[in-house]
């Protein structure tokens, strides 16, 4: 069974090694080029200052990761977060993603995040060589529902891709307490 822990900047090379093939060979990421290691570390620093970034490990190796980041960087949206997950190809379909997302949701709930959003590419044709329905199906199995559909919004590999926003509510919508940054939650501060 994989174990989970918070990511550190020392994990950046292993995490980038998981992410880069998604950029280079799929339309799962709409980036055209993988970020440099320095840029990836900078992204991680920005996330870890506010949100959790989790890694799953098994037998001493990182199997995948999941993190949250601002849904929209405006004060009124602070109780919403966008979530992202990437797994090593050989770890998909083995419960690693479910484990990561379940813990990520628990931590985000402790931050008083109420709604989670995932931006997911959708193939326009069956048997697309660069994009499948794996991510939309995974998110549906995790309780996400479609909140928005944007046709022809991503162009990669000489073809157009649709994009959906998926939403999952993890908290009530009464007047929320103040948003808490992840380092405070992790330290057990109220």
Predicted feature locations:
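A short beta-loop-alpha structural element at the N-terminal edge
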Residues: 3-15
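Conserved GNAT-fold acetyl-CoA-binding loop/helix
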Residues: 16-43
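Acetyl-CoA-dependent GNAT
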Residues: 34-90, 101-102, 107, 111, ...
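Conserved GNAT acetyl-CoA-binding A-motif
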Residues: 108-134
